[in-house]
Amino acid sequence: MPSVISTDVLIVGAGVAGLWLNARLRRQGFSTVLVESASLGGGQSLKSQGIIHGGAKYALHGALSGASEAIADMPRRWREALDGKGELDLSGVRLLSEAHYLWSPGTIAGNLTSFFASKAVRGRVDQVKGEQLPPALQNPKFKGKVYRLAELVVDVPSLIGRLAELAGDSLLAGQHIEPLFEGDELIGLRVDGRDIHAQRIVLSAGGGNADLLNALGVSQPQMQRRPLHMVLVKGPTLKPLYAHCLGGGPKPRITVTTHPAADGQWVWYLGGDLAEADGVARQPDAQIAVARKELEALLPWVDLSQAQWATLRVDRAEPAQSGLVRPDNAFLDSQQRLMIGWPTKLALAPDFADRVLSQLSGDGIHPTPQAALSDVPRPPMAIPVWDELLP
């Protein structure tokens, strides 16, 4: 193996954002090296609910921000990729649900009026009843209203597996990362003692970007973390449900997605307002008690007597901005050879890749032939959180 590896683009951080970018670059003929310090998708990606949303929940205020516009095209782009016809061939990736749903438990229809009048959702929402209802809501006791959103839910472990296949021989496991300078110019990184020179270096390590920026002596952009305290429940009586349950506020009262556990049972993964500030402040036992009470109030016909429970704390990493508001698009900052980015949302991974490709094009960076990476350590796949926490 040569003492110095040369590549067009060196990417650090193999979550969905880094893996998607890597696959796009390789498809366009660029040589790449993608470095991961732990496991593929093991940071934020595999803790995500897998919802590829088009911003519908952001329009709940009736006030449409830039977010809904920027994110509106994402479901179409993902769907095309999953059909094997898009910017990447993701055919074979498991789709958990063709749609995500909005459900109002029957007491609150008020905030739906302005919501459906907003252009964010016009033409993208249909009311469903009877047999069209999600399986978990098909019960005579269910009195609410349910709307189908033109959004989809992917099985993130299967997505990571496919993106890892598309990475070919470009993946490299590496823990210790130092900058390589020529004079004052950053020309590459030293990864566990291996020197890698690159035309461009992209940091897409989510929460790991903070330490990387520190190691490179870069003070801007700064990162912020928005914490969540998610709840997982597994049981033989659970049926698939992919839905935002509306409360009175601008955020969904609870967001439920359903995932296949290794033992064949379904796991409900609960986020939404439940997992936000009040939930973050609770201890795990208290958070589980609140989640249980919510499910018993909203879905009283579901027998939870044999259910297993766990909670999971997740930090959403994103560029720092005033007021800890939600970022509206994938973020990319470019400083000579270095690009620093946060997609901020699973759904925005294609937008993140667009921004990097556009920057490469603007900088006149073109593919150059490079030798394949051989005889290097490869990062392992991460274990899905529901199998880790509820074995």
Residue ranges and their predicted role:
Residues 99, 129-170, 273, 335-343:
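Helix-loop-beta segment of a Rossmann-like dinucleotide-binding subdomain
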Residues 12, 196-208:
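Short hydrophobic core segments
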Residues 203-335:
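Active-site substrate-recognition segment that forms the wall
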Residues 5-7, 191-200:
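Core beta-strand elements of the Rossmann-like FAD/NAD(P) dinucleotide-binding domain
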